[in-house]
């Protein structure tokens, strides 16, 4: 029965690997404006493909979901750690950015269903990054100006202006 059917293959991190087409079929992420047009939270089924972390940079392990804890095991990274790795400007413990502003666990773009509005879910250049949901109007600082979540995180980082 050995005809290329790899049943229990894993990569170097212990994640299961399918024997065919790993990482394919994910090129159309960032479905802009697709979401809960009638309000409510739209939570699509999670595709746990983890093929090098959706951005698929060759040779980059910065987008894996676990890291070595120094004791031979692995620990899951929090959403804040993943976001910090993607931001430019170093990986020091500068400030706690707050991550996704209380929307933990939501994947994909929720959107508002407006015409032509691109549902600024904060995924600027990070296609399909989990946890970056919303319309960009969460806590607009009282000015009425809509900001993306990435803009808010960048504001909190020193030296980004």
Curated annotation (Swiss-Prot):
Key words of the record: Repeat, Stress response
Gene Ontology biological process terms, A to Z: cold acclimation; response to abscisic acid; response to water deprivation
Ranges: Sequence repeats: 101-123, 124-144
Biased composition (Basic and acidic residues): 1-12, 143-161
Species annotation: Hordeum vulgare (Barley)
Disulfide bonds: none
Induction: By abscisic acid (ABA) and water stress.
Bias kind Low complexity: ranges: 93-107, 115-130
Stretches with biased composition (Gly residues): 20-38, 131-142
Pfam families xrefs: Dehydrin (PF00257)
Protein's name according to its UniProt entry: Dehydrin DHN3
Region listing for Disordered, in residue ranges: 1-161
Record region (2 X approximate tandem repeats): 101-144
GO cellular component: cytosol
Record-stated family: Belongs to the plant dehydrin family.
């Amino acid at each position: 029965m050995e005809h290329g059917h790899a049943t229990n293959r894993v990569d170097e991190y212990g994640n299961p690997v399918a024997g065919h087409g790993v990482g394919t079929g994910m090129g159309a992420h960032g479905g802009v404006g697709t979401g809960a047009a009638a309000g409510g939270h739209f939570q699509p089924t999670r595709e746990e493909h983890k093929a090098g972390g959706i951005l698929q940079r060759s040779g980059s392990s910065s987008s894996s979901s676990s890291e070595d804890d120094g004791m031979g095991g692995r620990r899951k990274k929090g959403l804040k750690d993943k976001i910090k790795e993607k931001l430019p400007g170093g990986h020091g413990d500068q400030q706690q950015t707050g991550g996704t502003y209380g929307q933990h666990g939501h994947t994909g773009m929720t959107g508002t269903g407006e015409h032509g509005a691109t549902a600024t879910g904060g995924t600027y250049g990070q296609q399909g990054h989990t946890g970056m949901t919303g319309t960009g109007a969460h806590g607009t600082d009282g000015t009425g100006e809509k900001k993306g979540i990435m803009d808010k995180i960048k504001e909190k980082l020193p030296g980004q202006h």
